[in-house]
């Protein structure tokens, strides 16, 4: 629950702060950028998130940082959906940083945040289910090599030694 609170507070702080909010790329009228941008922003957001998350996650696995940031999440060696957002507060701050990146790099509508967060929660819960929804052999397909599946993530939790 603390993680979700941090995920809500940090973007709101940047948006609502009188000295910071006016400098964000947040917009309120879809007509300002049009429907093409509204829908086209999502692939960009997911690509930005994947890049950000990959490097942040690798950094948190560094031996000098792991115990401070990421150990709490890895205490779940056979993760369940409840582990999806079981983070140390410092890790939660790092994870929510992508929302701050969005706020200062691309035009972003409040619905972008809502839809992106909803889809992220769904995929993160799936990633911690411990059972697979993709077909057998998917990990050998070219696309499967680029997608972190639930089983792959479960093995990451089970076999990683910090």
Label every model-predicted segment:
Residues 1-71, 75-103:
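Non-catalytic, topology-defining segments of multipass membrane proteins
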């Amino acid at each position: 629950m603390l993680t979700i609170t941090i995920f809500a507070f940090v973007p709101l702080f940047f948006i609502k702060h009188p000295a910071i909010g006016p400098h964000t790329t947040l917009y309120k009228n879809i007509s300002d950028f049009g429907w093409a941008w509204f829908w086209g922003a999502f692939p960009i957001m997911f690509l930005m998130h994947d890049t950000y998350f990959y490097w942040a996650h690798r950094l948190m696995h560094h031996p000098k940082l792991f115990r401070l940031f990421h150990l709490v999440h890895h205490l779940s060696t056979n993760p369940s959906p409840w582990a999806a957002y079981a983070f140390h507060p410092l890790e939660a701050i790092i994870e929510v940083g992508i929302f701050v990146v969005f706020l200062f790099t691309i035009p972003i509508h409040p619905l972008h945040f809502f839809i992106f967060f909803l889809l992220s929660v769904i995929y993160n819960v799936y990633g911690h289910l411990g059972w697979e929804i993709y077909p057998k052999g998917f990990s050998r397909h070219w696309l499967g090599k680029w997608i972190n599946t639930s089983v792959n993530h479960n093995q990451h939790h089970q076999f990683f030694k910090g």
